[in-house]
Amino acid sequence: MNPVKNQVPKVGFVSLGCPKALVDSERILTQLRVEGYDIVPSYDAADVVVVNTCGFIDSAVTESLDAIGEAMNANGKVIVTGCLGKRPEQIREAYPQVLAVSGPQDYQSVMEAVHAALPPRHDPFVDLVPDYGIKLTPRHYAYLKISEGCNHRCSFCIIPSMRGDLVSRPVDEVLCEAERLVRGGVKELLVVSQDTSAYGVDLKYAERPWRDRMYQTRMKALCEGLSELGVWTRLHYVYPYPHVDDVLPLMAEGKLLPYLDIPFQHASPRILKLMKRPGAVEKTLQRVQRWKAMCPEITVRSTFIVGFPGETDAEFESLLDFLDQAQLDRVGAFAYSPVDGASANALPDPVPEEVKQERLARFMAKQAEISALRLEAKIGSVQQCLVDLIEDDIAVARSRADAPEIDGLVHIQNGGELGLKVGDLVDVEITDSDEHDLFGDALPANVVPQQGRALNLQMV
């Protein structure tokens, strides 16, 4: 597998896990390209393979170990990084021949391991790498990671043990990166972190200069800066703190997408206390209602856990009641499963697996009814949409209410007829709906074509 002298060194790359891990992969890939490495889409063509792992839940650990094994069998020279890398003994027990193991966002260790296995070229490709770096997303949207780590200690979560406490990026650094992405053709910025609403608390909200004015390293100020770029900006992983209200005027004024991704997790005060989560359910409902009053177009997405240890029938019913009262637009849920290292594992009264699955099915059926009615109410409206895909004569897009991969789609029936392209912004008249998606026809006079180009690499 050793490269011939003067041949371009080739690296295979596998990226697993959440959008935050995807950003880590993009940063590593950017550095590899800057140093002259080719990124190849197969194990056979690679001189070495980097696997960026996930370790959040047991199924993710299994997927990561399987990916390492596949790379070992097909290539034999494997470098492991990412969240599962915080458990090197588990990786080396399964695969003692891996070349190196490092934890998340440890970019230097990854590069050192690559250098040791495969020295870089003397004539790197600096001029061939866009100033916004290598992106693994389609060219019209990008994840913008604003911080690492988390100060919360939720009992079901082990992220702080893997990624550490909150470390915010300076606001000017984030805004400059966003500006580079927009210059490269990105039309949607997806702000991600472990806790977006806590952004800047570790830096004591320090002020930094950008575009001839000072900005605090704080969520609201960051959003104000991003709104200057003239693209869609979507907030993910927001905690339901009171100061979230501060960004609602930006949404109401059209400067920020009217969208909040807030993981409520449950509606029982006792269960929330066991989870070590904020537990004032009445205040949460009041806050959701206030957001809708301040910005009637707002979309609220959330995630929940059913079958948490000790969850009673009555507490599960209270969760269903919460859905009825909150009328959330988008909801994700999963049945609780123990995570190695989580303090919730020690809680008494585990819920039987069959009960968890029955509750999950009821929960999702309840939310499907709510989502279907909320989508049906959009029939006859005009929604601005961003085209993600062209399939035959139909353009598959997302409205301002839909984040990529986790929310619904808008199927534009006359997309082919109008010659729509991926990355186009278009107004769509909604003609039909189901419990997940919308259907409609584009208004031809209101198409903003995609411009610019970002280098898009496919993951192995």
Curated annotation (Swiss-Prot):
It is found in: Cytoplasm. It holds the Pfam family Radical_SAM. Binds 2 [4Fe-4S] clusters. One cluster is coordinated with 3 cysteines and an exchangeable S-adenosyl-L-methionine. Keywords: 4Fe-4S, Cytoplasm, Iron, Iron-sulfur, Metal-binding, S-adenosyl-L-methionine, Transferase. Residues 136-374 form the Radical SAM core domain. Residues 376-444 form the TRAM domain. Its cofactor is [4Fe-4S] cluster. Coiled coil: none annotated. Residues 9-119 form the MTTase N-terminal domain. It catalyses: L-aspartate(89)-[ribosomal protein uS12]-hydrogen + (sulfur carrier)-SH + AH2 + 2 S-adenosyl-L-methionine = 3-methylsulfanyl-L-aspartate(89)-[ribosomal protein uS12]-hydrogen + (sulfur carrier)-H + 5'-deoxyadenosine + L-methionine + A + S-adenosyl-L-homocysteine + 2 H(+). This is Ribosomal protein uS12 methylthiotransferase RimO. It comes from Xanthomonas oryzae pv. oryzae (strain PXO99A). The gene is rimO.
